[in-house]
Amino acid sequence: MADKSHQCVIVGIAGASASGKSLIASTLYREVRERVGDENIGVIPEDAYYKDQSHLTMEERVKTNYDHPSAMDHSLLLQHLQMLKAGQAIDLPVYSYVEHTRTQKTIRLEPKKVIILEGILLLTDARLRQEMNFSIFVDTPLDICLMRRMKRDVNERGRSMDSVMAQYQKTVRPMFLQFIEPSKQYADIIVPRGGKNRIAIDILKAKINQFFE
């Protein structure tokens, strides 16, 4: 049964792939959690809402443009945000970067006072923007993002450097220019220099802490 008295604050963090979104989200989560406890703050990665592709062959899956809004199941994400705001728990999807589809597993996420939502395409969807109490765009130069992405995808996601570069040239950069960068206009706060901008993190942390006063 929904808890109508439950108030859930949604903080959106968007920006290019490997811009430092996840670092900012994890830093805010860790430092705010120390003060308010794990039961009051959580993180939802937009990546968890890539569409299920289990009906496709592996050859077809790798051809998907993962930087286009159509690759995301934003309708399910919207439903889950609305459920959390209504005081209902959700089953967060688990996506496999190796298999390029959702797994059969889910993660149970109980309602929290604050949910940090992070992903590249969050601000491109007006429905998601409507659910956010405030939003952040992490503004990092593309050449830095590319270097970070290559290191991450090769070391953590089993990719080759050639495949990472090919994907960057074919879809990542064009989709950033077409969809992600223009969505910066919808952000309440623009954070330069990525996840190591300590001053910006302290300001954001103070803003989030206001919701617990």
Swiss-Prot record:
Q: Name one GO biological process term.
A: CTP salvage
Q: Which residues bind ATP?
A: 15-22
The listed locations are: Cytoplasm
Which EC number(s) does the record attach to this protein?
Answer: 2.7.1.48
Enzyme class label:
transferase
Where does this chain mainly localize? Answer: cytoplasm
Q: Does the keyword Kinase apply?
A: yes
* Pfam families given in the database record: PRK
Keywords from UniProt, A to Z, are: ATP-binding, Cytoplasm, Kinase, Nucleotide-binding, Transferase
Quickly give the catalysed reaction: uridine + ATP = UMP + ADP + H(+); cytidine + ATP = CMP + ADP + H(+)
Can you name a GO cellular component term? Answer: cytoplasm
NCBIfam families with a match to the protein in the record: PRK05480.1, udk
Family note: Belongs to the uridine kinase family.
**Which protein, by its recorded name, is this?**
Uridine kinase
